[in-house]
């Protein structure tokens, strides 16, 4: 099974880590993780960690382009993933649901929980896949997100990046819009 989409980040205490897309079975996604160290102009592997399973993994077949950010105001880590329900590579894009999911944890290794209790789906990002957080403030319930448009966004947007989008999270209205999925 493919490992792809590596993302490097520093923890709150300055440790270098990596996460990437992985799977624990053909239809169950996970996020792989590793602790790294800088060695001159190289990066070396310190430890390959266990796969991080997502609390709602049964809602998707792939968790791609994982990115982890630290929120210094709350002390929480945020993990943003692009999720889809693709069953096989030959499946037409029109049959595949692509969404962004957000999780939070006190540790960069998890355990992870949906940002909204039972809700991980981020609203307001239709047509995007592989987005990044430009800014985040969990205490204010505010994210600024940018990402590439997919083919489903239409020919005028495909292969372009969105303008930054403000996403308000943590409110009851937001949770109701996002739905339990």
Which residues are covered by each model-predicted region?
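Carbohydrate-active catalytic/glycan-binding domains of CAZyme proteins
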Residues: 1-181
């Amino acid at each position: 099974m493919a490992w792809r989409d590596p993302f490097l980040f520093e923890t709150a205490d300055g440790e270098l880590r990596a996460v990437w897309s992985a799977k624990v079975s053909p239809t169950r996604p996970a996020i792989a993780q590793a602790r790294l160290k800088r060695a001159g102009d190289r990066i070396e592997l310190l430890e390959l960690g266990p796969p991080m399973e997502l609390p709602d993994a049964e809602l998707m077949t792939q968790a791609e382009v994982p990115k982890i950010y630290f929120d210094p105001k709350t002390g929480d880590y945020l993990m943003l993933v692009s999720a889809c329900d693709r069953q096989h590579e030959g499946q037409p894009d029109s049959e595949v649901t692509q969404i962004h999911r957000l999780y939070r944890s006190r540790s960069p290794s998890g355990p992870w929980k949906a940002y909204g209790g039972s809700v991980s789906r981020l609203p307001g990002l239709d047509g995007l896949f592989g987005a990044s957080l430009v800014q985040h403030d969990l205490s204010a319930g505010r994210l600024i997100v940018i990402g590439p448009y997919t083919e489903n966004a239409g020919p005028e947007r495909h292969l372009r990046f969105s303008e930054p989008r403000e996403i308000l999270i943590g409110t009851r209205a937001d949770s109701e819009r996002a739905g339990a999925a």
